[in-house]
A protein has these predicted regions:
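Accessory, non-ATPase domains that flank or precede helicase/AAA+ motor cores in DNA-metabolism machines
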Residues: 1-263
């Protein structure tokens, strides 16, 4: 039972919860009530004040970069009571610093259109999309998910761990932006924890992950996609043993939504 429960709680909370700390960022806030411009003689201090008069508060590193001052200027302003420092929690972002150009949906072939039109997103049923790598299955997934999102529902996409490459995730990010959460073993425990919370808090509308992502706290599922459904990794041989497809069927019946399998064999 304890092994099963571990699948349903945030990564890291089972035994090392004290080791996972929230990530914070140092911010600066302007204290207008203590501001007396007649006492500010430093041009560098005025640069910081002018920036904060427009923004009130901002990340300290951003202020440093924009105003081109040193931390000594902050210290001087803090001593005068003009600014305060505070820490603001920020989520770890597995894609931080990575630019993915936004993409528009592609024109579907007649065969792809036929496949998409035959998937009823309003009720439970199982569908199999067959096609070798590069045949266009992913574009069908993307346009199916777009239809689901337009109804106000969410989508879950499972991919074998070995196939969960940056190329795959980049295609989804390019189409849907930051409403995506990723869950796989190559993320740090802190990144997985924050992605889990992003899903739980309703900030993610699409979850992409390996086998265990089937237990992500995603609500209001409108479509569940299992890519490369023939892959043996979807069956867990370790405790707790489970068959991902069986769990997926249960979820789709519960949410009355389609279960879509993709296969190249």
């Amino acid at each position: 039972l304890s092994d099963s429960i571990k699948l349903l709680v945030p990564p890291g909370t089972s035994s090392i919860v004290d080791n996972i700390k929230s990530k914070t960022e140092r911010w600066i806030r302007l204290n207008k009530e203590n501001l007396d411009l007649s006492k500010i003689k430093s041009e560098k201090q005025m640069r910081v004040i002018n920036f904060l008069l427009e923004n009130i508060e901002a990340p300290a590193l951003e202020v440093l970069d924009f105003t081109d001052v040193t931390r000594d200027v902050f210290v001087a302003l803090q001593k005068k009571g003009v600014i305060d420092f505070f820490d603001l929690e920020v989520q770890r972002n597995p894609f931080f610093g990575k630019y993915v150009e936004k993409s528009e949906k592609l024109k579907l072939s007649d065969e792809q259109k036929n496949v998409l039109e035959n998937i009823d997103i309003k009720r439970y049923d199982k569908y199999l999309i067959h096609g070798v790598t590069g045949s266009g299955k992913t574009e069908v997934y993307l346009q199916l998910i777009e239809e689901v999102l337009n109804t106000g529902k969410n989508a879950l996409v499972l991919v074998p761990e070995i196939s969960l490459t940056p190329q795959i995730t980049d295609r989804f990010i390019a189409r849907f932006g930051d409403v995506i959460a990723i869950l796989h073993s190559r993320l740090s425990i802190g990144e997985r924890y924050d992605e889990w919370r992003k899903i739980r808090d309703g900030k993610a509308r699409i979850v992409i992950g390996a086998r265990s992502a089937i237990f992500a706290p995603l609500d209001n599922i409108g479509a569940l996609i299992i890519d490369e459904e023939h892959d043996s990794s979807y069956k867990s041989e370790m405790n707790p043993k489970y068959e991902t497809k069986e769990v997926a069927e249960y979820l789709c019946k519960m949410y009355n939504c389609p279960l879509v399998f993709g296969s190249a064999t």
